[in-house]
Amino acid sequence: MIFVRKQNFLLQRALLVLACLLLFNASQLLAQAIQGNVEAFAAEPYGVARLFIPAGQLATTTTLRIVVSDPSDRVMFPAIDFLTSEPPEVHSAQTGARQRFGNGALIGRIRTAIQNAKEQIDPPELIRVQFLFRGNEPFVVRLSGDMEASIDVRPIKLPDSTTAPDKQKQNSPSLSQSPQFQTLIRSWWDGYVQQAKRQLDRSDYPAIVESYLTHMLAYRYDFEIPDLLKKGATKRKQTDPLPTIALVAGVEELRAELFLESLRKSPPLSLRLVPTPEPPRWVDATVPYTPENLVIEPIAKMVPPECYYLRFASFSNYLWFQSLSQTRGGDLAQMAVLRGFNYETNKRMERLLNTKTTAIAKLFGDSIIGDMAIIGQDLYLQEGPSLGVVFEAKNIALLKSSFNADRVAAVKKLSDVGCKLEAIEIAGENVSLLSTPDNQVRSFMVDRGAYVFLTTSKKLVERFLEVSSGQPSLGDSNAFRFARLMMPVENKYDVFVYLSSEFFRNLVSPKYQIELRRRLKAIAAIEVAELATLTYAAETGIKDTFPSIERLTADGYLSPSFQSRVDGSQTLAFSGSWHDSLRGRRGSFLPIADIQFSDCSAEEAQSYRDQSAFYATQWQQTDPLMVGIRRFSRDPNEKVERLAIEAYVAPLGREKYGWLSSMLAPPVRTQIQLPPDDVINCQAHLAGQSTSRSFSPDHVMFAGLKDMVPPVPGETKGLLATLRTLQSLPAYLGGWPRPGYLDRLPLGLGGGPPDAMGFSKLFIGVWRWQMNGFSVLSFDRSILENCAIHLRPIPAEDFAQGRIRIGDLGKSRLSAWFNTFWFRRAAQTTRGNLMLLDSLQQQLKVPPEEALSFAERILDAKLQCSLGGKYILGKADSNSQKAMWESSAWPKQIVISGSKLPSLGFDDTKSMPPENYQAPWLQWFRGAQLHLTQLPERLIVVGTIDIEPIPVSPNEMAAEKSTNGPLPKMDLDLFNLPFQFFQGDKPKGDKGNEKKPAETRKSF
């Protein structure tokens, strides 16, 4: 027994010694590997260095945050990428004599064999860090973030050699022509370009720093200009409507394209100007008759017909809508798309007009304001919109007094930036103008009768005065009257939106399209100037003075053609920031409506003519769009609001929607009864297809998703993985009457004949059920068995071609899937913002404590943490690593069961949300039901959305109840409402459509 214990003791000690030896040996090997893989050549003005660091096994989906720095700020323009190391050769026997035992030979052989086997299966990754540096003395490079390391760099001084005269560029520093240096500098440049492309391909990462630096360095050192377009991006034809739609919506891809365009060197602009082209020749739509006694709200008679019209009917409705946009994502746009930055458009509008809503206004606004509407000629809230607010006063003297007091207070508050209040004359009327030199505040105020108008645009003041003096108004137009026939004032919409044909025509007019592209280029120029200023400070160390455009151009930070523009505008420094000489400060540009020009370049004219020809021939007319929202209580015992939504495109020009007309069959008053336990289902009445060989009747396609736990999102790469995911989906897809798609497949791939119960199985494991005219598919036979009980055609209360129903996803088992998907997207977006801050620190030498403010200034937006936290600056450690920004909501990383944490970085495809995480929209979304109907004269979307009430203070709740009372319960037939007030194009009842079809030989 004593002998056995002694043996165990000796064995334990031996294992402990073995572990220590392995640990010591591994650390020594790592240190030797790092120090043994450093190359550095010193030269003027910059040397170049490259080092390799072992990183273990990394998944291709892993992202790393690594910041490269040194105590003396000698490192410039680092590039980080990843390489797979070559696996070691495995020999059956080693050459040379070797010891059979002793001196660690056995341990060494075991360790080597295990490592070789592992690396043959999964070769380790290497992190390659390349950078330029100043000086020739040894220095220490430090890596911070996902990897902490310190590496000694001892540069080798190369013989002096300058760039050949025919290669040297004017005003650009030369690089050494030593072969060793050129090999390494080419490797650095390739890595730098690849790093920029990776960042550009990340949709959640605004890679403007990398885009600017790659172009600047390429021009400086005569490298080839890289193609930095995103993967899959193609240049669209001028006759494609999407570029114009992108201009109207201000799509980010277009901004990125114009940013890159501003970086390229272009030939001198042609001085030949041509007249601005004519707009498209639009065809006026025929508007149905409206009765003379139709009720039109008086405020609509004060609105120019070319303006959009957003009416709230009361001040409390406006407050509700404002809270909805702020609490449900910060912006209406962010209610649909989770983003890493917020343009704060509500605050911009309040700042421009000086209309910040106070607590007093919230309590007493309805006692002073009887009606209000936001109007404007465009929706470009980010740049400087042409918008205004019309107030219908219950007490005009009190309302004007309140506004005047606010304007006087603003002059005192903003006196340091030159804010002034003055009376000017427009169209013979005295108008109050509150403004600052950079257009941060630009608020015109004018009143007529019981109406007060606040606007950013002088042109809108002129149009308001013209309309109020008797010129045609929006309320007078036949199309608006038709809208009010379909959506009567008596319906008391909490929010009513009307976008007229004239509004859309104005947006695609030559003035708007040409000026919009010009102002987006001006924004890109301001961004480039900001980055050039930071790069100048990083390289020269001069941070206290603001360099001129001439200085930046002469030193190669800006292209020679930077200030060359058709409209003659310039990028100028003013009050410590860059402005456009014609339009003002970014985010507060002069409204497009107030910019006058009659000439344009030949290129601009031709581009617009191409676009105009498309609209004149393909669209021919613009269709008005109207939306109404009403609030109801879903159930008095539940804290859930029901939003009843009606949306119309009417009068409808069917030609431009030919793709929709060809796909949809006529609306019918028949629907398919689907299983009640579906958490999501939809159905659409589709047109049949007839060919010489086959025939498919008009049919209903339907699909549903059960309340079951689906597979974890993101695991669908590869055909087999996708098939496994589809097999695990608790879903079904069907058609009635059977369209026959499957039976046309060759070689019997559509499955054999059904059994007595109607079931058959396809070759990929899909079950099929056929009976009573139905053909339904699912990977789960039990789902089909459940469908067989419920599926049948039944009469519907309304005519429709599309119907969708979504249950309360937050209480379903599907919520885990949505939470995981949203968490991964939010985490990657948050991490992208952190990497932007890293880029400012290591590429442009911005002090860590200033990186956030600089990023927000360059983007003209607030960086927001999509996880719901705040960005905070961590503390630098004792080893002098740089302080890095973090998110206060960043969770401990959890991965899918059966997976392992990445050794470095963050892998969003395998990460799982914390237990208490919930997708933001699941916190307030409680269900929806929508119907789509296309009629000869109208396109209709009607439905309900159930949401949690917006949190308000007790005082605000009391004020709302005293004014409007509690929300009523919805007691109207919403889905049949479009046919009650206007029946000109209502489908006729067709018993044939409602008759149950006979069993046919055609199948799904």
Label the predicted regions.
Residues 810-856:
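Conserved hydrophobic/amphipathic alpha-helical signal-anchor segments
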Residues 355, 359, 398, 459-460, ...:
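Extracytoplasmic/secreted proteins, especially bacterial periplasmic and envelope-associated proteins
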Residues 443-466, 511-539:
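Extended, charge-rich low-complexity interaction segments
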Residues 435-439, 457-459, 644-652, 738-739, ...:
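Secondary-structure transition/turn motif
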Residues 53-54, 61, 67, 71, ...:
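Single conserved position on a long alpha-helix in the C-terminal lobe of the eukaryotic protein kinase
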